[in-house]
Design a protein with these regions (language model features):
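Structural and coupling elements of P-loop NTPases
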Residues: 1-333
Length: 333
């Protein structure tokens, strides 16, 4: 069992966009998330036979009874317009990058775009099995790019040069990567006990900067409980005032379940996102079309308000079909 906050109640449908530099493994993460949710995609197993993603991919799935829409955005700058449409429609973005700073040259541009959209986002450091230097150096490089403070949720565990697991900073539990996207609990290696304590203290300080009650506890040298930290993490991540950082290897199925559980706990729901974007309440349906394909016969849209049912008429000239982004699917012919 992967360390996580207390079981969350079933939420309404939510949506996330996966963005990242070309070659970061973003599409592999998309497929790993879908597979972990029981909705595997058909794609050549041999990476050499896979084609480069050149357009938006949309997947629907459920994880622990919560419904999700996941958008896989092309990483090449030539197709950045696909990403821009997605960012206007989702609840949160996941920035996928590699642990080597030199391989993340476009990450600053992505983070800048997210700042302009005022979109909550977290970072998934992919290909953690290729980590060559210090993970602290990776975090420092990412922090230099980010306007918002990073909140490192995990630390890698190494055996020699290999990354074999991770420590969940808040729960203080360690896990070894296993088969089928699993992770088995282990004791925290003795040489990582001090770094784990330092990481926890650093995380608490980041959160205390956002909450006076938590700051007062730290000043009085009272350690906050895990429940308090999880609650503050959820509040700050959903509001976009911090950027959580997780790690794993999508190609190896490592860190996928931990990412799913963080998404389930910390991604804001549709109502929060609508309020954040100034969408007023009401019964009249409000739909944002952010992508049209098949010569206008099919569109991707985000339902911000109300409900659209099959057979609902649309304004003259509107696309003939709408594919679900959140809340409820609609197809009008």
């Amino acid at each position: 069992m992967v360390g996580s906050p207390a079981k969350a109640a079933v939420a309404g449908p939510r949506s996330v966009a996966l963005i990242g530099p070309y070659g970061s493994g973003k599409s592999t993460l998309f497929e790993a998330l879908m597979a972990a949710a029981g909705a595997p995609l058909k794609r050549p197993g041999d990476i050499r036979k896979r084609v480069v993603t050149t357009e938006l991919r949309l997947g629907h799935c459920s994880f622990l009874a919560d419904r999700w829409s996941i958008l896989d955005c092309p990483g090449s700058v030539e197709f950045s317009y696909e990403m821009e449409g997605a960012l206007a429609a989702v609840d949160l973005a996941i920035v996928v990058c590699e642990p080597t700073a030199g391989r993340a040259s476009s990450v600053p541009l992505l983070l800048k775009a997210l700042e302009e959209y005022r979109l909550p986002h977290l970072i998934f450091v992919n290909k953690i099995d290729t980590l060559a230097g210090s993970f602290d150096d990776t975090l420092a490089a990412l922090q230099a790019y980010s306007k918002y403070p990073l909140a490192a949720r995990q630390l890698p565990i190494r055996e020699g040069d290999a990354v074999t697991g991770y420590i969940d900073v808040v729960s203080g539990r360690a896990y070894r990567y296993g088969a089928n996207q699993g992770a088995e609990p282990i004791e925290i290696p003795s040489q990582l006990r001090d770094p784990e304590k330092q990481a926890l203290d650093g995380l608490a300080e980041v959160l205390a900067d956002q909450d006076d009650a938590l700051l007062e506890k730290l000043i009085e040298e009272v350690a906050p409980t895990s429940a308090e930290l999880y609650q503050q993490l959820r509040k700050d991540q959903a509001s976009g005032t911090i950027v959580e950082v997780l790690l794993g290897s999508a190609a190896r199925g490592q860190g996928i379940l931990a990412l799913w559980k963080t998404m389930r706990h910390d991604v804001p729901d549709a109502a929060e996102t609508a309020a954040h974007r100034g969408v007023g309440a009401g019964e009249v349906p409000l739909v944002q079309i952010f992508k049209t394909v098949q010569a206008g016969k099919l569109s991707y849209g985000r339902i911000w308000r109300g409900v659209l049912l099959a057979g609902t008429s649309s304004a003259p000239g509107a696309p003939r079909a709408c594919r679900q982004m959140s809340r409820q699917a609609c197809r009008s012919y």
